[in-house]
Amino acid sequence: MRILVKISYQGSNFLGFQIQQHGRTVQQQFEKILKRMHKRHVRIHPSSRTDRGVHAIEQYFHFDTELNIAPDKWQYAMNSALPDDIYVNEVSIVDDDFHCRYDCVGKRYRYKVYQGKHRDVFMSGLKTFYADSLDLEKMNEAAQQFIGTHDFTGFCSQKTEVESKERTLYQSEIIKTENGFDYIVTGSGFLYNMVRVLVAFLIEVGKGKRQPEEVPILLEAKDRKQVPFTAPAEGLYLEKIYLAPQELINDFGPDIKIHRKKSLEND
């Protein structure tokens, strides 16, 4: 039986989602619980492998089990054993051929920035602080130019190891907030550090150091050295996982390009 689990977590005190040889991870927390229940190792398969310090409002994973436990009982058992910075929102039974990575057709991230004269210690780990004044209109103009299907070689970590660095973005926009801004980006998938590199570039645009007109040129150049900065992990939230094409169509219309996963991605 295949079980699908929908979770949220505050990522400040995790080394990321994926299991690490030394250190606290989200995967480690769940596999420890499942091992105790099954008396053997049970591997979980996530929709996304978030990095150290990255939060998740909506994240999924699946696992296989022979235990005859109702979904609500799974939820109760896990939440009873989990630390305060992880929560199971929902558990369901899915078809045996369902896969959290391969059936994921899209993801939405939100990057939160607050501004002001002074850093707020109570925002530490939850939002990124920038004291500089930023031109949000120009930032949004630049952000819009990332929408569509592009090769994002110049906007990801040089450690990215995938055959194709082409991704489709359905949404890329700057939203003004009460004390700063959010960057919201929805796409077919994301390369390693891609969202954080996009944010760092947009902030450079906001400072007047780069121009929106440079986006097509930089995409064509495919040279990370021309976009050298990466925004901090704090402030980055995995906000939504799209597990069905219809969900994407509902949000972005019937004419969008939908990608089916054939191999594992960096995120």
Curated annotation (Swiss-Prot):
Pfam families: PseudoU_synth_1. Keywords: Isomerase, tRNA processing. GO terms for biological process: tRNA pseudouridine synthesis. The keyword Zinc does not apply. Belongs to the tRNA pseudouridine synthase TruA family. Homodimer. This is tRNA pseudouridine synthase A. The gene is truA.
